[in-house]
Amino acid sequence: MNALVLEEVRTFQIRQVPQPVPKEDEVLVQVGAVGICGTDLHIFHGLANYHRDELGKPIPLRTHPQILGHEFCGRVAVAGSKVTKARAGDRVVVDQVLNCRNQGRVPRCEYCESGDSHQCEFGKELGVTGIPGAFSDFVTVPESSIVLLPREMPFAKAALIEPLGCVTHACDRVDRASARYGFEGKSRIRYALIAGAGPSGLLFLQYLRNVKRFDGEIFVADLKDARLALAQKMGGTPLDVRKVDMVSELLRRTKGERIHYLIEASGSGAVFDWLPWVIRRQATVLLYGGGHAGKDIGCLTQFQATETTLVTTAGASGGFDKDGTPTTYRLAMEYLCEGKIDADSLLTHRYSGLDQIARAFTEDANREDFIKGVLVRAEAG
């Protein structure tokens, strides 16, 4: 089969690789669509490498090239002999994290036992930790990693289930935190701020408006006009960080009250120049974006002084329904089916073949109008 292989930093090559063969409890998925994630971009540009040896040291691409792609869905091509959940031809989305449950480990680690499978002690991730991902024709996955898709859901939209699952999981982490300000009760959140209007930031905005039914003001900070315009259309108050002083502007707009709930979804180190000074005492800060290049952790001193509830989050995996379905993926799929999330506005760039993906990582990702890219494979139907 064909696969797009990352052989060196910023170097993709289409290669012929062996087509995987599913085990008796696995399915072979023909890739229908795969989203291009910020994590993929970080790995491509050499800013991150999550493929590590037993000591936690990164394994260089020249030693072990990688096949990226973890936000994916497709059609079951072959079902193993013990698979009962799906059969050939079924349309599925995939939870790409390999954990104790889908690896058949007994006993399960403490994280999988508590429903936090994304932190599995023995966890791996398709397309991220060195295991071949969906920038290829086919991928084998455990039966327990799939969720059946409705017939009417296009593959392109289904490729957003994983990133929306990340947002769903992150907001659940905040709900479970013992924080002063919440969406209900006496100390209600009145002002929220999302730093970054990329795909994740815009998903957070829609989640707060349409899932949490939050009716307070949501400021959205970014530096691209197209993203700010879309944020405003989705119910946010846009703030162009190039044109305003964020501290004075937010003090003015909140009448000195400051921000009760701040979501950092940009991954930009520059955010921390103003973030500690715009939040209210005992506010909640959700750290979602990755990277923050060029910044130390000096801002934590201010977080300590104001007793900030700092919530960190990673991934979309978590607990499972009684029938073994990954809960977060099911919820994300339901939000899309119910129309609570506008997927089409986020999918600004579509690609039809592996040979087009490199352009997404080099030229298109820097375009003013680029929000989210997705590869849609016509051959999967």
Annotate each language-model stretch with its function:
Residues 93, 260-263:
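N-terminal Rossmann-like NAD(P) cofactor-binding module of classical short-chain dehydrogenase/reductase
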Residues 144, 153-244:
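Mid-domain Rossmann-like dinucleotide-binding core that forms the NAD(H)/NADP(H) cofactor-binding site
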Residues 20-34, 49-108, 150-152:
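Glycine-rich beta-strand-centered segment in the early N-terminal region that forms part
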Residues 279-296, 309:
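ADP-ribose/adenylate-binding Rossmann-like module
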Residues 223-227, 269, 292-293:
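Helix N-cap at the beta1-alpha1 junction of Rossmann-like dinucleotide-binding domains, i.e.
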Residues 225, 273-276, 281, 326-381:
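C-terminal hydrophobic helical "lid"/dimerization subdomain
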Residues 59-65, 70, 99-191:
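NAD(P)H dinucleotide-binding glycine-rich loop of Rossmann-like/cofactor-binding domains
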Residues 252, 256, 295-348:
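C-terminal substrate-binding/catalytic core of Rossmann-like NAD(P)-dependent dehydrogenases/reductases
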